[in-house]
């Protein structure tokens, strides 16, 4: 039996089991199963270290345990070390290894949904300075973005993010300086939960963005956030956040089962149907 799980608190909302079990069935991997494992914060570190004893060959890690997983594991890939956060755990000959595929998922989604997109085209503007912003900023820099501009209500938090990641060309802006931040940018990314169902919307005038700019959002419920709708109506190219979820799952599945799965229209339709969307 090859068992893998997603660890979180809560974890009932996770669509990782739907994604991975779809791929397991598609590729005919016998004896494999992917399940949810709800783990409270005070038990997370011990559970993560004892994954093998619980019968798991690997795991995904979701909020609020990504930083706990990093601290609990002795081995990490280079990206997890830089981010100090783990979303994928793999069994290696040397033991459990923590990895982070969030940035990979973000970049792969843009390349998939916006063919021809190039990070080198110009500055990238990030709204927010939380955990998702860390992964996305690092990935964009690695992809060749010439400048990372971070807009955050608390500039000191954005400055700490840039310093901690060692970003080479980062600029920080307060909320009131958004017009300057957007001037000449090639990409705008909402890395916050603003715009998600039950949350307030992103309050931002995007008109200073040049016409060729791409606008994307990590939120995928709703699939088209108010930010994306406004951008689309203003003539900008847009990419929704669902693909980031789908693409970040690819490297882990390959590491666990030895097969590299594809993010297809069928998989996207399956997840959208589960979300009550079409």
From Swiss-Prot:
GO biological process: amino acid biosynthetic process; aromatic amino acid family biosynthetic process; chorismate biosynthetic process; shikimate metabolic process
GO molecular function, one term: shikimate 3-dehydrogenase (NADP+) activity
Keyword Oxidoreductase: yes
Pathway(s) served: Metabolic intermediate biosynthesis; chorismate biosynthesis; chorismate from D-erythrose 4-phosphate and phosphoenolpyruvate: step 4/7
Record: residues binding shikimate: 14-16, 62, 87, 102, 220
Top-rank lineage group of the source organism: Bacteria
Residues annotated to bind NADP(+): 128-132, 152-157, 218, 241
InterPro entries: Aminoacid_DH-like_N_sf, NAD(P)-bd_dom_sf, SDH_C, Shikimate_DH, Shikimate_DH-bd_N, Shikimate_DH_fam, Shikm_DH/Glu-tRNA_Rdtase
EC numbers for this chain: 1.1.1.25
Keyword line: Amino-acid biosynthesis, Aromatic amino acid biosynthesis, NADP, Oxidoreductase
Amino-acid biosynthesis found in the keyword field: yes
SUPFAM superfamilies membership: Aminoacid dehydrogenase-like, N-terminal domain, NAD(P)-binding Rossmann-fold domains
A cellular component term, taken from the record's GO annotations: cytosol
Residues annotated as catalytic: 66
Pfam families: SDH_C, Shikimate_DH, Shikimate_dh_N
Catalytic activity: shikimate + NADP(+) = 3-dehydroshikimate + NADPH + H(+)
HAMAP family: Shikimate_DH_AroE
Family assignment from sequence similarity: Belongs to the shikimate dehydrogenase family.
Function: Involved in the biosynthesis of the chorismate, which leads to the biosynthesis of aromatic amino acids. Catalyzes the reversible NADPH linked reduction of 3-dehydroshikimate (DHSA) to yield shikimate (SA).
Subunit architecture: Homodimer.
Protein name: Shikimate dehydrogenase (NADP(+))
UniProt organism field: Parvibaculum lavamentivorans (strain DS-1 / DSM 13023 / NCIMB 13966)
